[in-house]
Amino acid sequence: MKFKPLGERALVKLVEREEKTASGIVLPDTAKEKPQTAEVIAVGDSEDIKVKEGDVVVFAKYSGTEISLNGDDYMILDADDILGVVEE
């Protein structure tokens, strides 16, 4: 199944964080913070959205709508909730 966001929205896949601390302690799922970085999978049809497919973005902590497509978890973010693009 394909999904195309509408307007100024982006479909993103969360970038998972390391499950161990720097000192080697393994974190249980309940102790992990919700990730705030994601890879952009698809963007809406608005010319005002400033991200493109493949960008890694940082987004506001309590934003977005979680959805499941083909057994994978994604989020739909409004462009206003995207705080910036990670550049390497």
UniProtKB/Swiss-Prot annotation:
<dbReference type="GO" id="GO:0044183">
    <property type="term" value="F:protein folding chaperone"/>
</dbReference>
<keyword id="KW-0143">Chaperone</keyword>
<comment type="subunit">
    <text>Heptamer of 7 subunits arranged in a ring. Interacts with the chaperonin GroEL.</text>
</comment>
<dbReference type="GO" id="GO:0046872">
    <property type="term" value="F:metal ion binding"/>
</dbReference>
<comment type="similarity">
    <text>Belongs to the GroES chaperonin family.</text>
</comment>
<dbReference type="InterPro" id="IPR011032">
    <property type="entry name" value="GroES-like_sf"/>
</dbReference>
<dbReference type="InterPro" id="IPR018369">
    <property type="entry name" value="Chaprnonin_Cpn10_CS"/>
</dbReference>
<dbReference type="GO" id="GO:0051085">
    <property type="term" value="P:chaperone cofactor-dependent protein refolding"/>
</dbReference>
<dbReference type="InterPro" id="IPR020818">
    <property type="entry name" value="Chaperonin_GroES"/>
</dbReference>
<comment type="function">
    <text>Together with the chaperonin GroEL, plays an essential role in assisting protein folding. The GroEL-GroES system forms a nano-cage that allows encapsulation of the non-native substrate proteins and provides a physical environment optimized to promote and accelerate protein folding. GroES binds to the apical surface of the GroEL ring, thereby capping the opening of the GroEL channel.</text>
</comment>
<dbReference type="InterPro" id="IPR037124">
    <property type="entry name" value="Chaperonin_GroES_sf"/>
</dbReference>
<dbReference type="GO" id="GO:0005737">
    <property type="term" value="C:cytoplasm"/>
</dbReference>
<keyword id="KW-0963">Cytoplasm</keyword>
<dbReference type="Pfam" id="PF00166">
    <property type="entry name" value="Cpn10"/>
</dbReference>
<dbReference type="GO" id="GO:0005524">
    <property type="term" value="F:ATP binding"/>
</dbReference>
<dbReference type="GO" id="GO:0051082">
    <property type="term" value="F:unfolded protein binding"/>
</dbReference>
<dbReference type="GO" id="GO:0051087">
    <property type="term" value="F:protein-folding chaperone binding"/>
</dbReference>
<protein>
    <recommendedName>
        <fullName>Co-chaperonin GroES</fullName>
    </recommendedName>
</protein>
